[in-house]
């Protein structure tokens, strides 16, 4: 622990020195930079309890950074969380590097706007809590932290994954209360060690949104999605999967802090080889609740849709529920909770997988820059059919203690 503390202090010193450097005035033109930036560094020691990982211990050094500019016409944001985990004693559990990077660039004009985003990740297992998806690292959980992607709804053990999701959205104002919405998404999921089904998906959507008043809006949207499987190391019969959905959405801003959103509609599913995935008509929908109060936030999300199968099935019907809550007390103590339930029913006769997780975290700001934290996470998964050995098939508990370097948010201004 003393060695880790020395390492953390050294890294903090280097980072602060870099941020504090004064760059001399250049003779040429400079690109103005303005925005808010924040970063954290964490060191944690983790114990795993349950099954083959009972009494295993590991250590994690991690960090996260976030930046958003102040531009109203060209908004840009960046968020990255990653680190490295190594085994201390017992059976190694998800050791190695991990990272999740998210970029977003917008263009806002008087009658139209364009939003481009990309999310890329490398992990040692399916994501659960926090932006990085790795439990016990010390990064924030709960609150408005986005739920894990539905492309990995099956919990795994020591399973390297590479994932990327590129998204584009275009909105055009047609009149005072009507706008045209167009978008597209391309996703990929890869298993470098060959212990999962590589999956690609492409989605195109279009629709209209009607603004009823300052707080309420309705929308109708059509979505086309195609799933394909370029790599299949599990020996399952695969086929291209196509879904068509029509969703009708209602959104309401109850206050400046509270927003609810819900959509529902029919979904038609068909496989290129109907012997593997026959044609079917289903229901697709989602609902969300967001509350951003003064000293914290809360969220609740539900999704019912057809997925590519979570890396272990050829298509799946997914029910996903995720909740988060965080609250700050007296500017020194923060408590946070997050949890989720994921049910994946294989299309055809592939069985049902039920996964769930829950986490609690306590953070204490010891001084202006340093924090201490403790967290507890529990994962559990059951399946009605046999799954590969790298799919979680037991209850796993994760207990973590650590320290962090967490300076206040910085505001950057240059002309």
Task: List each language-model region with its residue ranges.
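Hydrophobic h-region of N-terminal signal peptides that target proteins for export
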Residues: 11-20
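Gram-negative and organellar
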Residues: 19-415
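Sec-dependent signal peptide recognition
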Residues: 2-10
């Amino acid at each position: 622990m003393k060695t880790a503390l020395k390492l953390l202090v050294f890294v903090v010193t280097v980072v602060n020195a870099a941020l504090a450097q004064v760059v001399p005035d250049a003779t040429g033109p400079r690109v103005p930079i303005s925005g808010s930036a924040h970063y954290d560094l964490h060191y944690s020691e983790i114990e795993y309890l349950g099954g083959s990982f009972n009494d295993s211990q590991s250590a994690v050094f991690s960090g996260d950074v976030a930046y958003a500019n102040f531009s109203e016409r060209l908004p840009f944001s960046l968020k990255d969380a990653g680190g490295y985990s190594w085994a201390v004693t017992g059976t190694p559990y998800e050791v190695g590097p991990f990272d999740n990077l998210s970029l977003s660039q917008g263009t806002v004009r008087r009658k139209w706007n364009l939003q481009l985003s990309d999310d890329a990740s490398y992990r040692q297992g399916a994501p659960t809590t926090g932006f990085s998806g790795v439990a016990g690292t010390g990064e924030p959980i709960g609150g408005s932290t986005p739920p894990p992607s539905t492309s990995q709804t099956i919990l795994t053990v020591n399973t390297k994954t590479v994932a990327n999701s590129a998204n584009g959205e275009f909105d055009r104002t047609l009149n005072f209360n009507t706008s045209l919405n167009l978008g597209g998404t391309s996703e990929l999921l890869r298993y470098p060690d060959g212990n999962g089904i590589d999956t690609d998906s492409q989605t195109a959507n279009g629709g209209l949104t009607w603004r009823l008043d300052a707080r309420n809006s309705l929308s109708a949207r059509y979505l086309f999605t195609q799933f394909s499987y370029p790599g299949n190391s599990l020996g399952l019969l695969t086929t291209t999967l196509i879904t068509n959905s029509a969703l009708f959405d209602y959104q309401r801003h109850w206050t400046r802090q509270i927003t609810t959103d819900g959509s529902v509609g029919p979904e038609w599913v068909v496989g290129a080889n109907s012997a593997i995935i026959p044609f079917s008509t289903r229901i697709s929908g989602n609902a969300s609740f967001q509350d951003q109060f003064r000293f914290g936030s809360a969220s609740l999300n539900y999704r019912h849709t057809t997925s590519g199968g979570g890396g272990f099935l050829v298509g799946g019907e997914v029910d996903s529920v995720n909740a988060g809550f965080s609250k700050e007390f007296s500017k020194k103590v923060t408590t946070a909770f997050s949890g989720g339930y994921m049910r994946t029913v294989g299309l055809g006769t592939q069985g049902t997988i039920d996964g769930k997780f829950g986490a609690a975290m306590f953070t204490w700001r010891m001084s202006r820059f340093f924090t201490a934290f403790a967290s507890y996470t529990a994962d559990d998964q059951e399946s009605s059919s046999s799954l590969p050995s790298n799919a979680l098939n037991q209850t796993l508990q994760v207990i973590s203690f650590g320290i962090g370097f967490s300076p206040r948010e910085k505001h950057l201004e240059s002309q």
